[in-house]
Design a protein with these regions (language model features):
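C-terminal accessory/binding modules appended to enzymatic or scaffolding proteins
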Residues: 446-464
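Short linker/helix segments within small regulatory modules
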Residues: 312-315, 469-483
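Iron-sulfur cluster-binding cysteine motifs and their immediate structural context
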Residues: 458-474, 485-501
Length: 614
């Protein structure tokens, strides 16, 4: 809401009267992080972690209003490089912005809080009123309200605000325990659970029936495209837990969520209120949407709210131990703090992935870019499609669940559908004329489930009526209304989506020439960046050109299914013509495109060679 500046006197933040349009997301920096980055070699400070000494914005470190250091690079097992900031004196000589040997003063928390109390009071009152007004509007229409609690800074503030806005008996708190949280997060959860129970507030922990190690081995490592982990380990267990608590399979509730618009490009498009965006069939309110991290931290200090020690160790977010949406220096800080726990997951990646450069694949985040089951050891397709003699055949060598149960969810099965058990497995067929139709898509989704379903229970959570159960095996109630929400998942089944192989099986590559004679041109890329999603609806490229260019955009992770990606938006912000942006794009291409990978593997560095040689 408010913009901020740095207060030289207190060493803290100072909210201004201006409304913030963009925040650099400041966070406090404690002694543990200073030591980790090697700043103890240059400046003196007490080895205490109760009060911060500096603030960090992205890669920059600010001490009492002056940028004194910055870091570059960093990866899972590679520390970022620390660079001290120099300033030029009048005589032209460069000196350290903060002289070596300086004794750092801790932030004066009480003074900082006092100087911000009026602005914080306004922010608090506005947010509390929004929460109460929302509750008042829906309290007679919904079965429950709950706070989605993660143990991070935003959810700690959110819970405090909801406590101030609503009667203690009117809501519950639900912690979505992925089983992959920081150990420091579990300490915060224990602490908050005890406080809630003392205050008469229901507190529940929701956890998947899968152990994370088992789900990683079942699905393969998650990635920024294959984000099965959030559904399997977070959203679905929360829905199922609330059904259990309320003893109502078709409950409709509202959750208070601590997302903020300034956290990421994607979240910048979130709305205050929504229906079905976070969890199908449920309402959500994002009370902190317009808060900046400056206001979050000031509110925490002003109200002496608990701070997850993960932040004191350099982590900007308190999430999962190894997240496909992370990478870079964030991975370094995580590993430095929780190395043994994280190594369990990196060892699992090594166990599962078939890559000759597996160490680089792990440490540089190649696993983050996984897009199918191609590189998973021993992965053989359990679903095969072929068109023959006027029919589309779906062949399932080893069915995992009953096709007749899943077929209950389909309103109008095609009259041409025929299913039989053959020696090669379960074989279903429909008329080939239906292949590109909506009904064929639905039938395929059902047989994806038949072939791959691992009882992750996401379909069960998606059913708004509670008509799907996996107790003792798959069972779909005959009262199913055939709404199709159980199929509103990527490819109808998360496990199929994660393990499916490319159409050619992903192993035999006929040619390295992945772009035929239509390598991407500057004009195409410029047009794509200027027009975004609109580019796919109207462009000047021919059929083969657009096909090859889509391959390029997909391999570079700039677009997927005719939609620009968050990575594209990031490179656009950096400046798509810059070396930095193209360096990032090249990294993606190396992992995904065999032609680019071949160049990297076979061409010597810093040498010119004729095209004919290549």
């Amino acid at each position: 809401m408010y913009d901020y500046t740095y207060d030289i006197e207190t060493g803290g933040l100072l909210l201004s009267e201006r409304i913030s349009q963009l925040s650099n997301e400041p966070r406090p920096v404690y002694a543990a992080e200073l030591n980790l980055l090697g700043m103890d070699k240059y400046w003196r400070f007490d080895q205490q972690n109760e009060t911060p000494y500096m603030w960090s914005e992205a890669c920059n470190y600010i001490y009492r209003g002056t940028k004194v250091a910055k870091i570059k690079g960093g990866a899972l097992c590679q520390a970022p490089v620390l660079e001290l900031v120099h300033t030029k004196a009048d005589d032209g000589d460069a000196t350290l912005a903060l002289p070596q040997g300086t004794t750092l003063l801790a932030v004066d928390i009480p003074a900082m809080v006092e100087r911000n109390k009026d602005a914080l009071s306004i922010v608090e009152q506005i947010t509390v009123k929004k929460i109460y007004d929302y509750y008042k509007r829906y309290k007679d229409k919904l079965d429950c309200f709950h706070v989605a609690f993660s143990g991070g800074k935003d959810s700690v503030v959110l819970l405090e605000l909801v406590k101030r806005a609503l009667p203690r008996s009117s809501f519950m708190v639900v912690f979505g325990d992925t089983g992959m949280e920081f150990s420091d997060t579990y300490r915060i959860i224990d602490q908050e659970e005890a406080i809630c129970r003392k205050d008469g507030i229901e507190f529940h922990r929701a956890r998947s029936h899968f152990d994370p190690m088992d789900s990683w081995r079942l699905f393969g490592p998650p990635s920024n495209v294959l984000r099965w982990c959030c559904s399997v380990h977070k959203s679905a267990p929360q829905t199922l837990k609330i059904r259990e608590v309320l003893a109502k399979g078709d409950y409709v509730g509202a959750d208070f969520v601590g997302v903020r618009a300034q956290e990421s490009v994607r979240r910048a498009d979130y709305e205050y209120e929504n229906y079905g965006k976070k969890q199908r069939g449920q309402y959500s309110l994002n009370p902190l949407l317009e808060w900046s991290s400056a206001e979050i931290w000031l509110y925490i200090f002003a109200n002496a709210l608990p701070i997850n020690d993960a932040y004191k160790k350099g982590n900007s977010r308190a999430g999962c131990l190894l997240c496909p949406m992370g990478g870079g220096k964030a991975d370094y800080f995580r590993h430095a703090a929780y190395g043994k726990e994280i190594d369990r997951y990196t060892d699992t990646i090594r166990e599962l992935i078939d890559d000759k450069s597996i160490d680089t694949y792990v440490t540089n985040g190649g696993w983050i870019s996984r897009r199918n089951g191609r590189d998973i050891k021993g992965n053989v397709s359990n679903y095969i499609e072929e068109v023959k003699d006027g029919y589309l055949y779906m062949i399932i060598p080893k069915p995992k669940t009953s096709w007749t149960e899943w077929m209950k969810t389909l309103a109008d099965p095609p009259t041409s559908l025929y299913v039989e058990q053959r020696k090669e497995g379960l074989v279903a067929r429909i008329s080939a004329e239906l292949n590109k139709t909506s009904i064929a898509k639905q039938v395929k989704q059902i047989f994806h489930k038949v072939a791959y379903c691992g009882a992750c229970r996401v379909c069960e959570a998606n059913c708004p009526y509670g008509y799907i159960s996996f107790e003792g095996g798959l069972h779909i109630d005959d009262r199913c209304v055939k709404c199709g929400k159980c199929r509103q998942i990527e490819d109808g089944c998360l496990l199929y989506h994660s393990l499916q192989l490319p159409k050619n099986g992903g192993r035999v590559m006929k040619s390295l020439n992945t772009f035929a004679d239509h390598a991407p041109k500057y004009e195409w890329v410029r047009d794509f960046y200027e027009r975004g999603d609109e580019f796919f609806q109207n462009n000047s490229l021919g059929p083969m050109q657009i096909s090859m260019f889509k391959r390029f955009l997909s391999d570079a992770q700039l677009a997927e299914k005719n939609k620009v990606t968050e990575f594209m938006l990031l490179t656009k912000r950096i400046g798509w013509e810059s070396d930095s942006a193209w360096g990032l794009i090249l990294i993606q291409l190396v992992y995904e495109n065999p032609q680019i990978r071949w160049y990297i593997d076979n061409m010597p560095v810093n040498e010119r060679m004729p095209r004919t040689y290549l």
